[in-house]
Every structure is written in C-alpha cells, then in structure tokens.
C-alpha cells in the first residue's frame, strides 16, 4: 500500500497531461527497445525520429497511463481492471509479458525526468508494476497465453 501511495504522490504531473507524458513513455520504450514498436502495427511505419511528436503515439500513450492511473488508485484491489486488460493484451494484441517490464523502465525514466520521481519513488513504482505484471501474468496463464 505504501508503494502505491508513494507513486501516487508523483502522479499529478502525469495526470495533468496524460498524452504528452504517455507519448514520451512510448517514444522512450521504442528508442530503448526498437523491436517493441513492431507490436504496435499502427506505429510500425513511423520513423524513430518522428515518434516523440506523433499525435497517435501520444494518444495511445495517454490511454496506457490513464489505465495505469486506475490501477494505481485501486492500490492492489485491481482484479476487475486487470482481467479485461490481460484478456485484450493476450488474445487480441498478443503482447508478451516481458514488454510490461520494458515499459516499466521507460515509465520510471520519464517520471524521474518529468515528475521528480526520486530513488525511493522509482523503487516504489517498480514494486507496484511488479504486482501489476504478476497479476497480468497469472491471467495470461489462465488464458493459455505464454507470449
């Protein structure tokens, strides 16, 4: 619970502009791990240098961070949020679980830069995302998706 609260303390700048911060997170993910861009068919043709300012990337990043905000505010009581998220990411989008770990690191980096997330906050964010990812993975297994 303390980890969720620690992350929520720095969540204000993210909530203030989900799309801008979300675009930064996805651009960072694609820069650090270029293969992840292939998992997003609508972004496949966007040149690396154009990702950061792309409106579609920003909009999708905003969607990702809004959902993460819901998960944070649920403070671990998130089964009703996780189940449909896992279902769509396993059955429709086919996103391997490791990619959630990769986006976690992109998010940590961006939140450090843009929201002043200190070392303790970074640890808290990694802990929270570890819980979320473990629950996603459990749902993936129930669905028979090993991606």
Swiss-Prot record:
BP GO annotations: removal of superoxide radicals
UniProt-annotated location(s): Cytoplasm, Sarcoplasm
Segments forming domain Globin: 2-141
Residues annotated to bind nitrite: 60
Enzyme Commission number: 1.7.-.-, 1.11.1.-
Keywords: Cytoplasm, Heme, Iron, Metal-binding, Muscle protein, Oxidoreductase, Oxygen transport, Transport
GO cellular component: extracellular exosome; sarcoplasm
Gene Ontology molecular function terms on file: heme binding; metal ion binding; nitrite reductase activity; oxygen binding; oxygen carrier activity; peroxidase activity
Recorded catalytic activity of this chain's protein: Fe(III)-heme b-[protein] + nitric oxide + H2O = Fe(II)-heme b-[protein] + nitrite + 2 H(+); H2O2 + AH2 = A + 2 H2O
SS bond partners: none
Family: Belongs to the globin family.
Protein function: Monomeric heme protein which primary function is to store oxygen and facilitate its diffusion within muscle tissues. Reversibly binds oxygen through a pentacoordinated heme iron and enables its timely and efficient release as needed during periods of heightened demand. Depending on the oxidative conditions of tissues and cells, and in addition to its ability to bind oxygen, it also has a nitrite reductase activity whereby it regulates the production of bioactive nitric oxide.
Subunit structure: Monomeric.
Name of the molecule in the record: Myoglobin
Organism (species): Auxis rochei
């Amino acid at each position: 619970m303390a980890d969720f609260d620690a992350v929520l303390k720095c969540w204000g700048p993210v909530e203030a502009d989900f799309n801008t911060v979300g675009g930064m997170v996805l651009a960072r993910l694609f820069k650090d791990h270029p293969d992840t861009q292939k998992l997003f068919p609508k972004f496949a043709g966007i040149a690396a240098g154009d990702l950061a300012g792309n409106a579609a990337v920003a909009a999708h990043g905003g969607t990702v961070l809004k959902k993460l905000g819901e998960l944070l505010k649920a403070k671990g009581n998130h089964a009703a949020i996780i189940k449909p998220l896992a279902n769509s990411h396993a059955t429709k989008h086919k996103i391997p679980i490791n990619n959630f770990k990769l986006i976690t690191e992109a998010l940590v980096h961006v939140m450090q830069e843009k929201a002043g997330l200190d070392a303790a906050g970074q640890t808290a964010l990694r802990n929270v995302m570890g819980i979320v990812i473990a629950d996603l993975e459990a749902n993936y297994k129930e669905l028979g998706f090993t991606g």
